[in-house]
Amino acid sequence: MITAANLLRIIFPFYDPEVLRWSGEARLMRTLFFAWMAMGVVVLFSASYAESLDTSGTGLSIILKQIAYLWLGLNIFNFLVRLPLQVCLKLVPWFLIVVLLLIFLTKSGLGVEVNGARRWISLGPILIQPSEFMKPCLVLQAANLFGNWHRFPWRSRLIWLGIFALTLGSILLQPNLSTTALCGMGLWLIALASGLPWIYLISTALLGITTAVTSISIRDYQRARVTSFLDPFADPRGDGYQLVQSLYAIASGGVLGRGFGMSQQKLFYLPIQTTDFIFAVFAEEFGLVGCITFLAFLGLFTTMGLRVAMRCRHRVKRLIGLGVVIFLVGQSLLNIGVASGALPTTGLPLPFFSYGGSSCLSSLVLAGLLVRVARESNEAEVIPLGTKTAPAV
């Protein structure tokens, strides 16, 4: 039955009076996520205004779409923070298989090619990127597998390791090396945190590095990204153009920045300024002070997220919390590294900043999982299901 309070929470998903009964850490994590989203909306509004005005005649088209995605994502977030993690762990194998099938469909007639890669499926006017939804699925299933490693028979272990490998391979073939690398590193770090034997970790790390090097060596565009990253000014109007314009934007920001809305590079000089290179617009408008402030925010988020995870007495829940922090913070640092020229150009968005429905929804699912971990770290808030829980550590 939908009560007036529930209806109000659906319409205004940031409104939730039940939050007052949560633990302090759960409330703090929710506040940090909302602050991150608020910063992202402000920056995206500025970065997208000129493009929206040029393509639709109004400067609000992109930001209004993003707000719609946030509204949907926040309702999913509110649902997940009330859903016991044991239920999530029971359902995630089915979700993972469905998302994997959707990734396969990107190579079929339903797949949409953008910039030489088939990573999207068209649903009328909406494009979805299945690989984004794989991230929370991998966090949950990896935490369950590696957290209960000794409970799984070898046959089950090999089946799930094979599914993980198939998932990474299917994303790589889109081609999408950056998301493959992020998911691979996320799985590896969750396995490391679970205490798996070093022989497994070292062998999989070597296999991953070999796969990445092979992919770069056989794909011309990936090799061009690496060479342009090493010296973007060698071809400033060709392969190095994106990075050169991004560096110009960051340098133009100086110490205090040009001011909100005053970026010059977003005026059709910097490509994909609303997605992969949105941090460059942020740096140009808010300067070194703004960049340091945002990095400090990421540091605070990482500290609190790790504290929430480490307080959990259940191994699987602890690994879920660690996995969420790894994916959100790791992706953020990779995006910033690309925009600042510290890493080769990739296609990873900046969570809660970059425009895109799939990325927005995926990030909010991860956020909901971490807040739920924070709620369940207080044993009084755990909802009993009458099922066997993960082993305590």
From Swiss-Prot:
A molecular function GO annotation: peptidoglycan glycosyltransferase activity
Pfam name, any one: FTSW_RODA_SPOVE
Record topological domains on the Extracellular side: 52-60, 106-119, 179-181, 263-285, 340-350
EC number of this enzyme: 2.4.99.28
Location relative to the cell: Cell inner membrane
Catalytic activity, reaction form: [GlcNAc-(1->4)-Mur2Ac(oyl-L-Ala-gamma-D-Glu-L-Lys-D-Ala-D-Ala)](n)-di-trans,octa-cis-undecaprenyl diphosphate + beta-D-GlcNAc-(1->4)-Mur2Ac(oyl-L-Ala-gamma-D-Glu-L-Lys-D-Ala-D-Ala)-di-trans,octa-cis-undecaprenyl diphosphate = [GlcNAc-(1->4)-Mur2Ac(oyl-L-Ala-gamma-D-Glu-L-Lys-D-Ala-D-Ala)](n+1)-di-trans,octa-cis-undecaprenyl diphosphate + di-trans,octa-cis-undecaprenyl diphosphate + H(+)
Metabolic or biological pathway, per its Swiss-Prot or TrEMBL entry: Cell wall biogenesis; peptidoglycan biosynthesis
Membrane topology: Multi-pass membrane protein
Entry-linked InterPro entries: Cell_cycle_FtsW-rel_CS, FtsW/RodA
Keywords: Cell cycle, Cell division, Cell inner membrane, Cell membrane, Cell shape, Cell wall biogenesis/degradation, Glycosyltransferase, Membrane, Peptidoglycan synthesis, Transferase, Transmembrane, Transmembrane helix
Main location: membrane
Transmembrane segments: 31-51, 61-81, 85-105, 120-140, 158-178, 182-202, 243-262, 286-306, 319-339, 351-371
Keyword Cell inner membrane: yes
Any one biological process term the GO annotation gives: peptidoglycan biosynthetic process
Record bears the keyword Cell inner membrane: yes
Cytoplasmic compartment segments: 1-30, 82-84, 141-157, 203-242, 307-318, 372-393
GO cellular component entries: cell division site; plasma membrane
Function comment: Peptidoglycan polymerase that is essential for cell division.
PANTHER family: CELL CYCLE PROTEIN (PTHR30474), PEPTIDOGLYCAN GLYCOSYLTRANSFERASE FTSW-RELATED (PTHR30474:SF2)
Family statement drawn from the similarity comment of this UniProt entry: Belongs to the SEDS family. FtsW subfamily.
Protein name (Swiss-Prot/TrEMBL): Probable peptidoglycan glycosyltransferase FtsW
Source organism (scientific name): Synechocystis sp. (strain ATCC 27184 / PCC 6803 / Kazusa)
Encoding gene per record: ftsW
